[in-house]
Amino acid sequence: MIPKEPEMLLSYVNMKLRDRYASFEEMCEDMDLDPEEIRTILAGAGYRYDGTANRYQAEIETVR
């Protein structure tokens, strides 16, 4: 079971990505996780996956 609270989930997912997996998709497949559920929870808290950095991070809003 993975954490459902956004900040705990963020920490958990980023730790797994850093320590074990080359991509978010690989992690979800290997751990039998629903990627859409994770994306929805983290997006709702303002986080997005950066494939280049292989981690979730805060979305940056552009100032006009």
Residue ranges and their predicted role:
Residues 1-25:
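N-terminal acidic leader/helix
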Residues 28:
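The alpha-helix within a helix-turn-helix
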Residues 32-61:
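Short, charge-rich amphipathic interface segments used for partner binding and complex assembly
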